Every structure is written in structure tokens, then in C-alpha cells.
Amino acid sequence: MIVDAHQHFWDTGRIQLPWMTADHGAINGIFEPATLAPSLAAHRIDRTVLVQAANFDSDTDYMFELADDVAWVGAVTAWLPLADPGRCRERLAELDRHSKLRAVRHLIHDEPDPHWIMQPEVLESLALLAESRLILELPVVFPRHFRDTAELAGRFPELRLVIDHLGKPPIGSDRMDEWEALIRTCASHQNVYAKISGLNTTISRADWDVNDLIDSVTIAIDCFGPDRLMCGSDWPMSLLNGDYDRVWETLVEALERVAPDSAALILGETARDLYELDAPSRRAIGAG
């Protein structure tokens, strides 16, 4: 099974994304299953993980409205009001009717509190996620996010955490050593996973190629191993610096150069197992 472990849907005419600015012109519009399907077919991608794009209920409802009718969407990473444990529990009970619910994400980098994820109310909700066997995805952007992720991993050993986009390695800068040290600290916790995704949009040049990705991919494989790494296109965000074909083909080439014997795991098997894409629903996971 080949899995694109990180993609989005949105219709900005229907749901306004707070982070969308004039600089995002190429992706300001409608990006739904019919647009993505040909690219998935061209690369023989069997399943995707659909990920939230905004911190509110309407975005999550919109995702499920689409995902429930699309066979190749294998899992959904939803949004829950983690800062309100009571409402979080109620909302989770509502969303449990959707068989593809597997994970939760909050855009922590948009919060004014730099350590929002460590607030007592949020921690109470994270305990609920662990109890409910939901994955927590983290859009790690700043050094503090790495440190908070490592602390959460130690505090909730039963909670599976996923670092999106490898924590945005500063490709081509003199801060790569700092990034490597931070992500290795997170990877030392066996309940932390990562996605090799979104790397092309961390590069300012339009003429990026596979050589720009090699160092980040090599470090990721060395510290996580292939059984805790996944690959994602980050479509349509990726369109800001490359089309789907270029992004996916370059990721595959990087994996085949660095770890050809592990490419199958990273390109699908790890995501299949972590998100339990073969299970009929989250409620069935772990049933004896």
C-alpha cells in the first residue's frame, strides 16, 4: 500500500482560512477530491491521510463531508477544542460516528501563548486523546515546539504523537545542526513519529531538487527509523513551490537514494499501521 500521509481539502469561498493571505494566491480557491484524484492515480497511491486546515469545527465538518464519500481517504486528522476539556469530550462523541477519525491536530503556531499545548486544560484533553486511542499531530515550527513535544511524549507514553513536515528543517541555512539536535531529542521517545512532507515549501528557491532534501531525509531516517516515518505531499500547500508530480517524485527519489530497502515502509506501510487504515473504524482498533 502506498499512502500520501498528509494532504488537505479546502474551499476558501465556503470556509475562510484565517492564515490565508494574498501571498497564497496559488492555493486560494477550491481544492477537493476531484482535483487530487488524477495525481494519486498517476502515482498509484492507494490511500491518503486528510488533515485539518483550521482551528474550528466547520473545517472538520467539511472534511468529513468529503471524506465519508471518498474511498481513497483512509484517515482524517480532525480538530477538537482541546482548550475546553468538557466541550472536547462532547465534540469527540459527535465525531465518533465517522469511521475515518484517527487523529487530532491544532495549529499551535497560531496561538499567542508560545506553550499553548502545555496548558492544564489542553493536557486534560490530551489525556482523553490517549484514552480514546487518537493520534496527536503537531505542526512543529519553532524550537519550543520540539521541546514541548518531547515533554508530552514523556508525560503521555501511551499517546502517539506525529511531527508534521519533520518540524520544518531550515534547509540550506546554518541552523540545520540546531534542528537536528531538537528532532533527535523528540525521536528518542518511541511514541513520536514524523512525516517527511512540506519540505519544498521551506525552500525559497523555485529550482529546488532532490539534493536539497537528502540531508533532512538522511537525518530523519537515522533518528526515527523507517517504522516511525511517513511520506506526505502536503497538497495543496505544496503547490506554492512545485506541482504534485514534482513533489512526490522527488520524495520517492530521495528515499530510494538514502534508504532503498526502507522506502516501502516510509511510503505506505508505516502510515497504514499507525493510522490503522485496514481497520473499519477507530472503535474496532484493538478489539480482541
Model region roles, listed by residue range:
Residues 58-151, 195-199, 206-207:
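Active-site gating/metal-coordination segments in enzymes
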Residues 1-3, 26-47, 219, 223-230, ...:
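Mid-to-C-terminal alpha-helical segments outside catalytic/metal-binding sites
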Residues 31-36, 58-61, 87-90, 146-147, ...:
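Alpha-helical scaffolding within the catalytic cores
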Residues 58-72, 156-162, 213-222, 244-254:
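Short, electropositive alpha-helical surface patch
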Residues 21-29, 34-57, 73-81, 102-106, ...:
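Divalent metal-dependent hydrolysis catalytic cores, especially in the metallo-beta-lactamase
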Residues 6, 48, 63, 76, ...:
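Conserved, mostly hydrophobic/aromatic
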Residues 116-230, 284-288:
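Catalytic pocket-lining loop regions of alpha/beta-barrel enzymes
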